[in-house]
């Protein structure tokens, strides 16, 4: 009998598996609204000018490619901290934030999960309903039981505020609560500042451990605005975790540039926490890759490149907003009986469209339009050339 004879075929990843199916589709007019990637008006993944300039400078400098420290590039880690907590953060001045480079936002989440398993081995993890599909898998892989807290209200196309607070309050004390800091994936429906304050009150009262995931900073209302939840928590006195990613905001998907930040109570505590996180990193991948983080670091720490990047990110954010509004208009123009105005109020790269799994399947089989079975569509994949095709098809499957 073969060593692998009992190995079962794993189910396809709901998003990356969709991409595989899309690539295998030979129809010329196919459209991919599934994977979370920003495309420009020409339907291509852009190479940002700020990134090009940073890469050019790095190539011309003939920088060596030796091993990085376990925690990554120091200037990168510091740039991440300032982006999240602000240049004048009291936490940073007090040495109360530990940041390590990570292999994408996914890697940051897994590092945090593995470290938390050592700290709180019997804790429960709570994620929003719905949430990014990999949240559950990552924390279950670390050995945690994972449950949902209510978040999205389909009737109002908004946040189920009462259900959210009730469920957070009902969790066992010292639970780990994963929260989308901005641009909620998959719904595009965010908490407002007053909501965050109420959530924070419950977390403090119950002794929960917040784990903020921020993969889309700058795609909601702006770089500073999208960090509002992180900065509110920074003022709370709580210790908490933040996973962040630059895949989207720098259009560096294949470089896997992320970071894990942990807020502690003191500089001494930070040193001890960092030593343990480094142990987790060492047993996972030893140390992180150089190129992507060096590019991001160069941009964040150069006033000229930082300004150019913020301009380019603003242009991407504006294009997504324009596509949202145009989608709402065209759906109505093509005869949709349903009110889709909520799409225009959502933030970030995604929209929870309200389409059923059967309707999504019809979009794929009849029109070659791929979306996630939950009805999540990537608004960043819309453009003026494909919008009419997409909206007409949606109206036909309603």
Curated annotation (Swiss-Prot):
Q: What is the name of the protein in this document?
A: Aspartate aminotransferase
What's the family? Belongs to the class-I pyridoxal-phosphate-dependent aminotransferase family.
* EC numbers on record: 2.6.1.1
Q: Name one GO biological process term.
A: L-phenylalanine biosynthetic process from chorismate via phenylpyruvate
What are the UniProt keywords, alphabetically? Aminotransferase, Cytoplasm, Pyridoxal phosphate, Transferase
The cellular location(s) given in this protein's UniProt record come to: Cytoplasm
Q: Where does the secretion signal sit in this chain?
A: none
What Gene Ontology cellular component terms go with this record? cytosol
> Where along the chain is L-aspartate bound?
36, 132, 185, 376
Q: Which cofactor does it need?
A: pyridoxal 5'-phosphate
Give the reaction(s) catalysed.
Answer: L-aspartate + 2-oxoglutarate = oxaloacetate + L-glutamate
EC class: transferase
Q: Which proteins does it associate with, and in what oligomeric form? A: Homodimer.
User: GO molecular-function annotation terms?
Assistant: identical protein binding; L-aspartate:2-oxoglutarate aminotransferase activity; L-tyrosine-2-oxoglutarate transaminase activity; pyridoxal phosphate binding
Q: Which PROSITE patterns match?
A: AA_TRANSFER_CLASS_1
Q: Indicate where the modification N6-(pyridoxal phosphate)lysine is found in the sequence.
A: 248
Encoding gene (name): aspC
Work out whether the entry's keyword set contains Cytoplasm.
yes
Q: What is its main location?
A: cytoplasm
């Amino acid at each position: 009998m073969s060593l692998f004879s009992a190995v079962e075929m794993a189910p396809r990843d709901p998003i990356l598996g969709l991409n595989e199916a899309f690539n295998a589709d030979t129809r010329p007019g196919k459209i991919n609204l599934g994977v979370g990637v920003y495309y420009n008006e020409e339907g291509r993944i852009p190479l940002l000018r700020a990134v090009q300039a940073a890469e050019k400078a790095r190539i011309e400098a003939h920088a060596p490619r030796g091993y990085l420290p376990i925690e990554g590039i120091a200037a990168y880690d510091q740039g991440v901290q300032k982006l999240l907590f602000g240049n004048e953060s009291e936490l940073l001045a007090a040495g109360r934030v530990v940041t390590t480079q990570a292999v994408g936002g996914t890697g940051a989440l897994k590092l945090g999960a593995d470290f938390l398993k050592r700290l709180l081995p019997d804790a429960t993890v709570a994620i929003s309903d719905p949430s990014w599909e990999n949240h559950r898998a990552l924390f279950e892989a670390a050995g945690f039981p994972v449950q949902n807290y209510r978040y999205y209200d389909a009737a109002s196309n908004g946040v189920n505020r009462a259900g959210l607070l009730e469920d957070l309050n009902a969790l066992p004390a010292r639970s780990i609560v994963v929260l989308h800091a901005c641009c909620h994936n998959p719904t595009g429906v965010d908490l407002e500042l007053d909501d965050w304050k109420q959530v924070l009150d419950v977390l403090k009262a119950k002794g929960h451990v917040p784990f903020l995931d921020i993969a889309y900073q700058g795609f909601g209302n702006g770089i500073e605005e999208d960090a509002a939840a992180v900065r509110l928590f920074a003022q709370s006195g709580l210790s908490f975790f933040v996973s962040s990613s630059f895949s989207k905001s720098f259009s560096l998907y294949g470089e896997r540039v992320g970071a894990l930040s942990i807020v502690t109570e003191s500089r001494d505590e930070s040193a001890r926490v960092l030593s343990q996180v480094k142990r987790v990193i060492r047993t996972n991948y030893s140390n992180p890759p150089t190129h992507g983080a060096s590019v991001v670091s160069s941009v964040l720490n150069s006033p000229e490149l930082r300004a150019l990047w913020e301009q380019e990110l603003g242009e991407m954010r504006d294009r997504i907003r324009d596509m949202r509004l145009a989608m709402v208009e065209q759906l109505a123009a093509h005869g949709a009986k349903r009110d889709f105005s909520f799409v225009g109020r959502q933030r970030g790269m995604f929209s929870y469209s309200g389409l059923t799994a059967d309707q999504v399947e019809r979009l794929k089989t009849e029109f070659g339009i791929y979306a996630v079975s939950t009805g999540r569509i990537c608004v960043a994949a819309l453009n003026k050339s494909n919008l009419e095709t997409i909206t007409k098809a949606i109206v036909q499957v309603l």
